[in-house]
Amino acid sequence: CVGLGYWLLGNDTPQTTFVSGGISIEPGTTKAVLVFNSGQQVKLTDSIAFEQAIEKFKPSGQVEQAIEYNKIIVPRGGEYNLVLADGTSVMINSDSKLSVPDRFEGKERRVRLEGEALFHVAQDVEHPFIVETDGGDVTVLGTVFNVNAYSGEDYVQTTLVEGRVAFQGKGMTDARTIAPGE
């Protein structure tokens, strides 16, 4: 919910340190690590954006073949905003990992999440957007939503801001469509 509020208010709000019972609570900072399929790692900061890192560190002269998945790892106390190749914007929360393809091809757009992220999905009715988690898959039907799927938790929580999503838990045969307020 904190990430959702931050996303809705925008990234230009002043950073504030909260004090509770003598303990300082610092706001999250923009930090993440991009791990390429090859294992090479690049620290993502304000000065090195996700898109720049992909272009800068992509091996030159290589013919594009199979889709490669890169992983964005956001450590505790961090957060990271990025825009995917299809125009979908994602705010990845603290202690989370998002695996994304170097390009979207085929009938669907699929990413894998461990942790929490807020998605503002670029609408494309011909190519559904799917967030895969350990607990199940969230299929987006053009929307803004948050997914909370941390490792070790017994649940996957989806908070819908607008639009609709369909959730199909692991081992379930049918998906359940969810609208705001449900």
Q: PLM features: what roles do these ranges have?
A:
Residues 1-155, 166-182:
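Short acidic/polar, Gly/Pro-enriched loop/turn segments located at secondary-structure boundaries
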